[in-house]
Amino acid sequence: MKCIVGLGNIGKRFEQTKHNIGFEVIDYLLESNQFKLDKQKFRGAYTIERLGGEKVLLIEPMTMMNLSGEAVGPLMDYYNVDPEDLLVLYDDLDLPQGQVRLRQKGSAGGHNGMKSIIQHLGTDNFKRIRIGIGRPTNGMSVPDYVLQKFSKQEMETMNKVIEHSAHAVEDYVSNSRFDHVMNEYNGEVS
């Protein structure tokens, strides 16, 4: 079974913020496949469904971003999911807005949600989809920037990015060759 995790913060005030783009992709997958996060355990909202004919565990941690590993680690242990079958979707300040980068493994790159997952799993050997949100301009702090909602114009671009990322997840689940999925989906979304 593959495990797909979208990172974000819980609560209405965080909806459609830059930091919640991982949740947005999971929500897109849920809606387009008529799934619901109908279970809660270990501080995570989740469901187990069939996607592309394959069994998949979809998770949104309910821990707030910086503690994401506290939900992901125990749920993966409980369902006996190997870290190599994990794919995490999250925002990335170091990529321009509208760009998507898939990776087989790697460091947290300064992302506290990813640091927490790596710490709780004891490895960084899991797949990820980094979704570019760009860096703040005109002196805005990083925390203020990532917790800012997308503008209407930005949301037009990000809706395409969300759909693109969801298709990458679907292709990953049905295609065991992640390098093929990387070749297909890495880059700027237009």
UniProtKB/Swiss-Prot annotation:
Subcellular location: Cytoplasm
GO cellular component terms given for this protein: cytoplasm
CDD domains: PTH
GO biological process, one term: rescue of stalled ribosome
Main location group: cytoplasm
InterPro entries xrefs: Pept_tRNA_hydro, Pept_tRNA_hydro_CS, Pept_tRNA_hydro_sf
Sequence positions that bind tRNA: 14, 64, 66, 112
Keywords from the named record: Cytoplasm, Hydrolase, RNA-binding, tRNA-binding
Catalytic activity line of the entry: an N-acyl-L-alpha-aminoacyl-tRNA + H2O = an N-acyl-L-amino acid + a tRNA + H(+)
SUPFAM superfamilies: Peptidyl-tRNA hydrolase-like
Positions annotated as active site in the UniProt record: 19 (proton acceptor)
PROSITE patterns per record: PEPT_TRNA_HYDROL_1 (PS01195), PEPT_TRNA_HYDROL_2 (PS01196)
Residues with site note (Discriminates between blocked and unblocked aminoacyl-tRNA): 9
Enzyme Commission (EC) number: 3.1.1.29
Gene Ontology molecular function, alphabetical: peptidyl-tRNA hydrolase activity; tRNA binding
Feature type site, description Stabilizes the basic form of H active site to accept a proton: 91
Pfam annotation, one family: Pept_tRNA_hydro
Complex and partners: Monomer.
PANTHER family reported for this sequence: PEPTIDYL-TRNA HYDROLASE (PTHR17224:SF1)
NCBIfam families per UniProt: pth (TIGR00447)
Function text: Hydrolyzes ribosome-free peptidyl-tRNAs (with 1 or more amino acids incorporated), which drop off the ribosome during protein synthesis, or as a result of ribosome stalling. Catalyzes the release of premature peptidyl moieties from peptidyl-tRNA molecules trapped in stalled 50S ribosomal subunits, and thus maintains levels of free tRNAs and 50S ribosomes.
Family: Belongs to the PTH family.
Protein name listed in UniProt: Peptidyl-tRNA hydrolase
Species assigned in the record: Staphylococcus carnosus (strain TM300)
Gene this protein is translated from: pth
